[in-house]
Amino acid sequence: MKSPCTAIVTAMLILMAGDVEGQAPDASKTDKAVISRLSVQFGINSKIITHLDLTPTFQTKSRWSLVIAKQPDEESSVEDGGGNRIGAVSICFVENGEPDCSEEMLLAKYREAKISFVAGEHPFYELFASDVVFSGPGRTLPLLRIKSCTNRGFNGNCGVSTFLFAYDRNADKFRVVFFNMTGRNNNEETRLVQSGPLLGNVIVAYPTSNAPFTYFVEVHKRTSDSEYSRVLTYRGTTGYGDGNALAVIDSEMPETLRRLGLWKIGDPLPVPPNTRCARLVMRKGVEWCDPH
């Protein structure tokens, strides 16, 4: 038989648990608020494609959610390079149930980079990623990542934007700490490193425009609660269409680490994340997946 004290404590715990559960955000209500807000903005009822409750992971003061919606393609007046109608993607931050779908802090980054868009077009038409990534050891220092694409050209190419957001506890707001845009047709990549000696860094690989046709590699690092800043840029030796099964960032990793003083010839080769390669080798300063 439980003692009176035990029963009281148990009852208090049940009441506390019920109170916390009662404070949980109503995702359906939030989504409806976003759809209503976007309908007023664009005159089109969008469909919710992402809903992330940011409160638990970032331990936010207010209730924060990320809600992303897409306009139905058939109701859009915008066409892609192939003549197909394509609906815009809208990104909304929701604080205590109140959606902000203005995307002003995202658009500000485009203006800073002097990137403009065709009149009447939206910056986002395809969503590649909307998730939480970790920039510290043991899945710490979370960042919110959004990766999206502009309207596609006739060859399918588009501008791939990568945004990383950190939670500012003092301001109780999310803010952009990293932004860039690349193409997508030539093995470009922007990657937040989540393990190894470059944990928390962002690596970018993008093609050169003149011979020899290789790739530029950049490393961006964040210190304290500041934005990311570039700490390394070099022209790599990975060639276009060289047949290497590794991504450009992985093929260039030994050289990237060497230039940062984190690897030297004779050290074990860096193992790419999620690799299925049975044998890694070096060829002319580039890491290769050897199929033989």
Residue ranges and their predicted role:
Residues 1-5:
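Positively charged n-region of N-terminal signal peptides that target proteins for export
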Residues 84-90, 152-165, 209-221:
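Structural motif
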Residues 7-16:
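Bacterial N-terminal signal peptides
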Residues 90-112, 163-180, 219-233:
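Surface-exposed loop/turn elements that mediate protein-protein interactions on large endomembrane-trafficking
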Residues 89-140, 146, 151-153:
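Short N-terminal edge-element motif at the start of the domain
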Residues 154-205:
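Short helix-loop boundary/capping segments
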Residues 142-148, 202-207:
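Hydrophobic beta-strand segments that make up the repeating blades of beta-propeller
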Residues 19-63, 68-84, 189-292:
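Acidic, small-residue rich beta-repeat scaffolds with periodic aromatic anchors
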